[in-house]
Every structure is written in C-alpha cells, then in structure tokens.
Amino acid sequence: MLSNSTSRNRHSKHNKKNTREDFDGYYFNKNVVICDDKGQKITAKVYKTSKYWLMLKTSDGKTIFMNKAFIKSIELAEEEEKDDLA
C-alpha cells in the first residue's frame, strides 16, 4: 500500500513542471496575418498574449481578442518579414 501512495505523490500537481512550448515571443508586438478555423484572414498587430488568448490591434484601431484554439496559422506580415531580413 505504501508504494501506491508514493506513486500518487510523485505525480501530484505540485511536482509537475510546465513544459508547454509556445511561440508567443516570436510574433509578439509584430504585424501578422492570422488564418482562423473558418479560413478568414485577419491582419493585425499582436498586442498581448496569454496561455489561451491573443489580443490583436488592427490598423483601424479595433481590438480583437482571439482564442488560440481557433487559429490555423500565423504568418508575419510582409513588412515585418522585410524588417527581419535586414
């Protein structure tokens, strides 16, 4: 019985490390083109990020909160790509 309780303690939430890798830092504060799950493209600047959400600012000043689960792809906007290459 003792081995079972030790096993549970070993897998407790307290001992787990967050090993989730994301790329938020790569596109943070850059202009991007996001393709959502419906195929719509949104061009905006990534203003803030969290575990599940992106806060985007469009060129006309509109704020969009987008759940990452509905994003198919994120590409740097053309002007950002040129800046990265320079």
Swiss-Prot record:
Residues 1-21 are annotated as: Disordered. It comes from the Viruses. Residues 8-17 have a biased composition (Basic residues). This is Uncharacterized protein ORF86.
